Amino acid sequence: VIVSNLSVCMVTCWYRNISMANYSENLINALMRRDISVKVVTSDCVCKNKYRDSSSLFNGKYCLVTTPFDSYGDEPDRSRIRGLSYRTSRIPLGWLYAKQCRDSDILHYQQSNVFSFGQLPLLTLPIQRKGPHTVVTVHNLDPHPLYRVYHYADAVIVHTEQQKDRMVQAGIPENKIHVVFHGGHKVNLRGLVRTRVTFFGSPAKYKGFFDLLKALRILRDKGIKINLEVYGIYGKEEEQTAKKEARRNNVEDQIQWYGSLSELEFDEKMQESIFTFAIYPVPVWGSSIITRAMMNGTPVIATPLGGSSEYLGDTGTYVPPNDPSALASVIRSLLENRRLQEDLGKMARQRALQYLSWDAIAEKTIRIYQSVIDA
């Protein structure tokens, strides 16, 4: 039996159009459709510098928690002393978050590997004896994670079985860990002509973008010139680094650089894409690019890391990480096979509608809330 009048305090990144904020917003909307009361608690983080020219940082209603050192995170070239001060100041954020959540039944912490929403605020969990039940969704594991902090959460949510296995191996009790897929918002297919090859997200090396540039160079050397459109929220420094790498590979004239998109524009560009990429060289646990591509019926070329294959199944086209030659071969073969493009897109959408709806994600999440309350 579900507790009536359940209240949840969602601690999350809330920057407009950042993937984790989109995740939280979609989950919150689905929870509220089930009469769950949700309060959003957020703070500034290092991504703030990406919004320097924007008049709007956040979505909807929220409670903003601040510390004296927040401005240091907005400095791309901060000194080592300021960097240390900023990192250290993230720890007491855990107390400040909990203070805002003290009247809720559940404190649901959306953890990324970014400072204000990373593991540092969770270091206060062991000494927070009173307060709501704590549920932590781990979107990305830190490179050097402090796994002990998860022992003090009432439940931990991860996005793939691979991620769960990694945490069990680190000693986290298996009965605390729940696998809940990253959701995707259902969209209507508009019958748009698919003519674009696109990359969504930051054009960074850790996203596989540099491997993609090398693959484009390999194809160009074989007489196949492919234009690539880049969409996402990224800073000028990231863009300049990526442009330098494009010049080094002699493909700079093939890249069109675009900025962030509204939700409607994102789906439109996705539906105009022949295929897109999730070619991470390291595990990314629950990619919103994959889920959104699937909902839009767009084929995905992916590396089989972090559980990508758990989402895509037979609908994915897979390449080894850090292998531009294999990537070039897959791009060419998929471009030359229109029937395969159509079949993969249809199967991906069917799979997404079956497993990845936000209503299904919310139902699983509510059952986890209930389990920690009943424990």
Model-found features: residue ranges?
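Glycosyltransferase donor-sugar binding loop
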Residues: 227-241, 259
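Acidic donor-binding loop of glycosyltransferase active sites
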Residues: 270-285, 298
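Nucleotide-activated donor-binding/catalytic signature segment of Leloir-type glycosyltransferases, i.e.
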Residues: 240-267
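A short, well-ordered alpha-helix in the C-terminal region of glycosyltransferases
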Residues: 333, 340-355, 364-367
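Conserved acidic donor-binding segment of nucleotide-sugar-dependent glycosyltransferases
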Residues: 314-324, 333-338
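Conserved donor-binding/catalytic core segment of Leloir-type glycosyltransferases
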Residues: 9, 189-207, 213-216, 229
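A conserved mid-protein helix/loop that constitutes part of the nucleotide-sugar donor-binding site
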Residues: 21-26, 204-218, 240, 291, ...
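Donor nucleotide-sugar binding/catalytic pocket of nucleotide-sugar-dependent glycosyltransferases
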Residues: 143, 154-188
